[in-house]
């Protein structure tokens, strides 16, 4: 679906309109940093041929379904054993717009992988939220808005936060109701670095405040929320996340910088992820309709978050490494029927290899090992709560 998002109220956050595509493509074709970044993914890229193909794209839809699709599938081919999706029968009928809310593992690929698979099953690609903290270079903002992303403003003052949230929420409601285009948003601000996936109440409150009803629950139901469970066999950034945990433990004032975000994006895109699976879960409006819309606000938000979390926990796909990690972390053999000696040996070798990549002056390997084991066992731990 390729509809203009023309409202001037959203000019600073919306995706590009089709009338802006030509200028955006010219900017990208002339940008050496953009070319350099693409060569990481496609080392043998013929830039002249690619530039011609870029200029042939007259709409966002053409760009997304050809060049962007090809780039994402190249990443999948080079860095995954498989990329699969299930639950397509649960997608809204007649391609009705919805809000996909998922757990969050990879800065770039969560939404990118979801979109190529939705395209393959005939549903169509979504609009995607991206934090402005990741727009480290001007060409990145041009690219993501060309690729139908809208901008989430992160670094604003407390005084500005309410207004920024209202505008963002109003835009999402606009995309769903007026443009009839689905939206992807993570269940929390930033990745769940310990893989303990929990929907943040602040995200749900933000989604509700741009609605046209005076009730939080009804406004969220208007967005037709569909949870998505994302399951990576291996997280290429697990060692970076563990390193950050130790740095924050040792220095409570530690704050990561732009270089860290760039490294995480690059590491996530270029390195092995093994099997990757997306499960489309059931739309939750029927479950939300059973809640008391007049419940105390924070209690209601918590109840809605639990509905989303439960769908994600129940539909997570587990690999041998998840079971091995749980047993190693807890000193048990509870899940030994789900893996063999070879699986255990391979994961232990993988774990040590990731730990060896961490360079810190006071490296606490026992702590780092525990953190990585938690990343792989927490989804299983959360699943067990649904039984």
What is each of the regions a protein language model found here?
Residues 67, 164-168, 300, 304:
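Soluble or luminal CAZymes and related metallo-dependent hydrolases
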Residues 312-387:
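Long, low-complexity C-terminal extensions of enzymes
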Residues 250-327:
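A cross-taxonomic marker for long C-terminal extensions/tails that follow the last structured domain
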Residues 61-63, 71-284, 341, 351, ...:
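Soluble catalytic domains of membrane acyltransferases
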Residues 46-52, 211-220, 225-231, 293-300, ...:
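C-terminal intrinsically disordered extensions
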Residues 1-98, 104-115, 119, 141, ...:
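Membrane-anchoring hydrophobic helices of lipid-metabolizing enzymes
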